[in-house]
């Protein structure tokens, strides 16, 4: 059943401090838009985020595709922008290894994701140990609260993340009520009757395009929100060729927020 509570109501009762903060931020900025900023240089990365910042609740990164990455040059300015525009950060790392390995991948290496990213995500293919490994890494790395999304469904054509795989991923999410805050999915994932309030973030959302040549499939904002999406993830629709990030940021923010108001019967 689709959750029709307001973001404020959900913030008041949620067990995760990350989810609480995110819901409150979404309500105060009146946005459920996440910008997926996949570009290859730090300068373009930061410039786009600065332009889109006023319209978003969350920025989604693939930090390992930035050719000139450095912690001081890329992450420190990103954190400054997150404070300037009041948004949270989601590193779309898609961890998919045993618990001990992901623990090191999350906390260390070049990117030190646990130090700066509020939210990250993981596949369920290796079992529930991945949740415990990531949670331990977060606890040992920072005093700041962190949250995990499980990849339950994908928007790409031919994805095998459905059916039994999705069901098993949901079961893994149930192993930790505080750290696992929700899913990357195309619809509501249930759990309310067992006391879970999972946040559903959905990629593959577009107001204009229906897909691309590499298997991406787009659904409309109204369609995804009405079936349970809490946060719409938009990338090329915001800053692709011929698109103005300021114009598109406002356009998608309004579309997402209006769909949320409709779902929660506030209009």
UniProtKB/Swiss-Prot annotation:
InterPro entries: Aldolase_TIM, OMPdecase, OMPdecase_AS, OMPdeCOase_dom, RibuloseP-bd_barrel. Keywords: Decarboxylase, Lyase, Pyrimidine biosynthesis. One of its GO terms (molecular function) is orotidine-5'-phosphate decarboxylase activity. Its EC number is 4.1.1.23. Pathway: Pyrimidine metabolism; UMP biosynthesis via de novo pathway; UMP from orotate: step 2/2. It catalyses: orotidine 5'-phosphate + H(+) = UMP + CO2. Belongs to the OMP decarboxylase family. PANTHER family: OROTIDINE 5'-PHOSPHATE DECARBOXYLASE. This is Orotidine 5'-phosphate decarboxylase. It comes from Scheffersomyces stipitis (strain ATCC 58785 / CBS 6054 / NBRC 10063 / NRRL Y-11545) (Yeast).
């Amino acid at each position: 059943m689709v959750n029709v509570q307001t973001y404020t109501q959900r913030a008041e009762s949620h067990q995760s401090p990350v989810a609480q903060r995110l819901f409150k931020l979404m309500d105060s900025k009146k946005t459920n838009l996440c910008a997926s900023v996949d570009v290859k240089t730090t300068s373009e990365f930061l410039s786009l985020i600065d332009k889109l910042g006023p319209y978003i609740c969350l920025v989604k990164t693939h930090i390992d595709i930035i050719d000139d990455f450095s912690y001081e040059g890329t992450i420190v300015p990103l954190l400054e922008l997150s404070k300037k525009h009041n948004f949270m950060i989601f590193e779309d790392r898609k961890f998919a290894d045993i618990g001990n390995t992901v623990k090191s991948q999350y906390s260390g290496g070049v990117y030190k994701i646990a130090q700066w990213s509020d939210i990250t995500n993981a596949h369920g293919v290796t079992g529930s140990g991945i949740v415990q490994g990531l949670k331990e890494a977060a606890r040992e790395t920072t005093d700041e609260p962190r949250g995990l999304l499980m990849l339950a469904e994908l928007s790409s054509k031919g994805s095998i993340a459905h059916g039994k795989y999705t069901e098993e991923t949901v079961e893994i999410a149930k192993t930790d009520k505080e750290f696992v805050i929700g899913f990357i999915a195309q619809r509501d994932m249930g759990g309310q009757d067992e006391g879970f309030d999972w946040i559903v973030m959905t990629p593959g959302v577009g107001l204009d395009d229906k897909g691309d040549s590499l298997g991406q499939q787009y659904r409309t904002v109204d369609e995804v929100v009405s079936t349970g999406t809490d946060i719409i993830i938009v990338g090329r629709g915001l800053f692709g060729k011929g698109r103005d990030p300021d114009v598109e940021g406002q356009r998608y923010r309004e579309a997402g927020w209006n769909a949320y108001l409709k779902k929660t019967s506030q209009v």
